[in-house]
């Protein structure tokens, strides 16, 4: 479920800080010739630390109830980071084609003329049917084949099946609470709630 914010709920506050952390468990093994062997110990995931200003009662109630409801029903907490909302790419992504069998750290999008504009390096990217959020590391347009190739970090969490479409806007991080504990109610003498924070980690479905 979507984390309440000013875009979706008039009573919801915006956060004052959003610390996005790259967690990429890698094992490094130095070889006799001096080279370093890198082995992925587990899948990469993003974690997110959200901090909020002092909250009025209704603001606190909206946020805490949403968190408790997500825990109750076993749902993810979906977070939009407004600094990545740029709409550099528009058009009709449903008319593009992502062929089946793609894996690794890049993706090729066919029928690219259905899209207008181009993403910047560092923009977020998703594909339909996948929960993982990626960052764009490179962009190559091939006019002859009417395709674009995006370099992605991290690598694709699962192999494409040919039904996916690209997502460049309104990208949601599908997160869960790190310890499934709701934030503490810290009410001061002025009736304001202090120190509301959320520590979340990405919930990646790689099946």
PLM segments and residue spans:
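Extracellular/virion structural assembly segments
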Residues: 1-207
């Amino acid at each position: 479920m979507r984390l309440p914010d000013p875009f979706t709920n008039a009573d919801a506050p915006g956060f004052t800080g959003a610390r996005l952390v790259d967690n990429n468990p890698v094992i490094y093994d130095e070889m006799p010739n001096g080279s370093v062997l890198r082995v992925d110990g587990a899948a990469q995931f993003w974690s997110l630390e959200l901090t909020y200003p002092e909250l009025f009662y209704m603001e606190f109630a909206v946020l805490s109830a949403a968190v408790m409801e997500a825990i109750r029903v076993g749902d993810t907490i979906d977070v939009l980071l407004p600094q990545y909302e740029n709409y550099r790419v528009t058009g009709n992504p449903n008319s593009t084609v992502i062929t089946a069998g793609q894996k690794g750290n890049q993706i090729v999008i066919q029928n690219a003329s259905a899209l207008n504009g181009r993403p910047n390096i560092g923009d977020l990217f998703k594909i339909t049917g996948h929960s993982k959020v990626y960052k764009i590391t490179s962009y190559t347009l091939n006019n002859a084949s009417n395709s674009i190739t995006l370099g992605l970090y991290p690598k694709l969490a699962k192999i494409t099946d040919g039904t996916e479409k690209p997502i460049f806007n309104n990208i949601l991080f599908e997160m869960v609470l790190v310890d499934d504990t709701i934030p503490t109610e810290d009410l001061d003498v002025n009736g304001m709630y202090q120190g509301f924070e959320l520590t979340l980690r990405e919930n990646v479905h790689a099946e």
